[in-house]
Amino acid sequence: MTQLTLYEEAMCCSTGVCGPDPDDELVEVSAALDQLENEFDVDVSRANMQHNIEQFLETQQIADLVEEHGPSILPITVVNDEIVARETYLSYDELASTFEDSPDPQEA
Protein backbone atom coordinates (compact mmCIF):
# COMPACT_ATOMS: atom_id res chain seq x y z
CA MET A 1 0.00 0.00 0.00
CA THR A 2 1.24 3.46 -0.89
CA GLN A 3 1.63 5.89 2.01
CA LEU A 4 0.88 9.59 1.48
CA THR A 5 1.46 12.10 4.26
CA LEU A 6 0.61 15.75 3.91
CA TYR A 7 2.39 18.03 6.40
CA GLU A 8 0.55 21.33 6.74
CA GLU A 9 0.75 24.62 8.61
CA ALA A 10 -1.29 25.17 11.77
CA MET A 11 -5.02 25.19 11.03
CA CYS A 12 -8.20 25.35 13.11
CA CYS A 13 -9.05 21.70 12.38
CA SER A 14 -7.37 18.66 10.86
CA THR A 15 -8.28 19.57 7.26
CA GLY A 16 -8.71 23.33 7.42
CA VAL A 17 -12.16 22.84 5.86
CA CYS A 18 -14.28 24.24 8.64
CA GLY A 19 -16.09 27.39 9.58
CA PRO A 20 -18.47 29.43 7.45
CA ASP A 21 -15.94 30.29 4.71
CA PRO A 22 -13.34 27.50 4.21
CA ASP A 23 -10.36 28.10 1.92
CA ASP A 24 -11.23 26.88 -1.60
CA GLU A 25 -7.78 25.35 -2.07
CA LEU A 26 -8.19 23.25 1.10
CA VAL A 27 -11.62 22.09 -0.07
CA GLU A 28 -10.05 20.95 -3.37
CA VAL A 29 -7.19 19.19 -1.55
CA SER A 30 -9.60 17.33 0.72
CA ALA A 31 -11.67 16.21 -2.27
CA ALA A 32 -8.52 15.12 -4.16
CA LEU A 33 -7.29 13.07 -1.19
CA ASP A 34 -10.69 11.40 -0.80
CA GLN A 35 -10.73 10.56 -4.52
CA LEU A 36 -7.19 9.12 -4.32
CA GLU A 37 -8.17 6.86 -1.43
CA ASN A 38 -11.12 5.59 -3.49
CA GLU A 39 -9.15 4.98 -6.69
CA PHE A 40 -5.72 3.82 -5.49
CA ASP A 41 -4.36 1.53 -2.80
CA VAL A 42 -3.21 4.50 -0.72
CA ASP A 43 -3.24 5.35 2.97
CA VAL A 44 -3.54 9.13 3.37
CA SER A 45 -2.65 10.96 6.55
CA ARG A 46 -2.56 14.67 7.25
CA ALA A 47 -0.46 16.32 9.92
CA ASN A 48 -0.90 19.96 10.80
CA MET A 49 1.43 21.85 13.11
CA GLN A 50 -1.28 22.75 15.60
CA HIS A 51 -2.83 19.33 16.10
CA ASN A 52 -0.07 16.85 15.14
CA ILE A 53 3.26 18.45 16.07
CA GLU A 54 4.57 15.04 17.21
CA GLN A 55 4.46 13.80 13.59
CA PHE A 56 6.66 16.71 12.54
CA LEU A 57 9.13 15.99 15.34
CA GLU A 58 9.20 12.22 14.73
CA THR A 59 10.07 12.64 11.04
CA GLN A 60 13.61 14.04 11.00
CA GLN A 61 13.58 15.11 7.35
CA ILE A 62 10.41 17.17 7.91
CA ALA A 63 11.59 18.59 11.24
CA ASP A 64 14.88 19.68 9.64
CA LEU A 65 13.14 21.39 6.70
CA VAL A 66 10.72 23.28 8.95
CA GLU A 67 13.55 24.29 11.29
CA GLU A 68 15.69 25.52 8.38
CA HIS A 69 12.97 27.24 6.30
CA GLY A 70 10.20 27.93 8.80
CA PRO A 71 6.54 27.12 8.20
CA SER A 72 6.65 28.78 4.77
CA ILE A 73 8.06 25.44 3.48
CA LEU A 74 4.63 23.89 4.14
CA PRO A 75 2.70 22.11 2.82
CA ILE A 76 5.04 19.18 2.22
CA THR A 77 3.71 16.10 0.43
CA VAL A 78 5.47 12.79 1.13
CA VAL A 79 4.79 9.58 -0.80
CA ASN A 80 6.42 6.40 0.50
CA ASP A 81 8.94 8.44 2.55
CA GLU A 82 9.95 10.57 -0.45
CA ILE A 83 9.17 14.28 -0.61
CA VAL A 84 7.31 14.91 -3.87
CA ALA A 85 6.28 18.55 -3.27
CA ARG A 86 6.83 21.41 -0.88
CA GLU A 87 5.46 24.94 -0.55
CA THR A 88 2.39 24.01 -2.62
CA TYR A 89 -0.56 21.66 -2.68
CA LEU A 90 -0.64 19.21 -5.58
CA SER A 91 -3.76 18.76 -7.68
CA TYR A 92 -5.51 15.41 -7.98
CA ASP A 93 -3.83 14.77 -11.35
CA GLU A 94 -0.37 15.60 -9.97
CA LEU A 95 -0.90 13.33 -6.97
CA ALA A 96 -2.29 10.50 -9.10
CA SER A 97 0.75 10.66 -11.39
CA THR A 98 3.07 10.16 -8.40
CA PHE A 99 1.26 6.91 -7.59
CA GLU A 100 1.39 5.72 -11.17
CA ASP A 101 5.15 6.44 -11.29
CA SER A 102 5.94 5.05 -7.84
CA PRO A 103 6.15 1.29 -7.23
CA ASP A 104 4.11 -0.09 -4.36
CA PRO A 105 6.56 -0.71 -1.47
CA GLN A 106 5.25 -4.30 -1.17
CA GLU A 107 6.11 -4.93 -4.82
CA ALA A 108 9.60 -3.41 -4.69
Swiss-Prot record:
Keywords tagged on the record: Arsenical resistance, DNA-binding, Plasmid, Repressor, Transcription, Transcription regulation
KW Calcium (keyword) present: no
A family per Pfam: ArsD
GO biological process: negative regulation of DNA-templated transcription; response to arsenic-containing substance
Molecular function (Gene Ontology), one example: DNA binding
Record-linked InterPro entries: Arsenical-R_ArsD
Induction of synthesis: By arsenite and antimonite.
Observed phenotype of the null mutant: Deletion of the arsADRC operon results in increased sensitivity to arsenite and antimonite but not arsenate.
Function: Trans-acting repressor of the arsADRC operon.
Protein name: Putative arsenical resistance operon repressor ArsD
Organism whose genome encodes this protein: Halobacterium salinarum (strain ATCC 700922 / JCM 11081 / NRC-1)
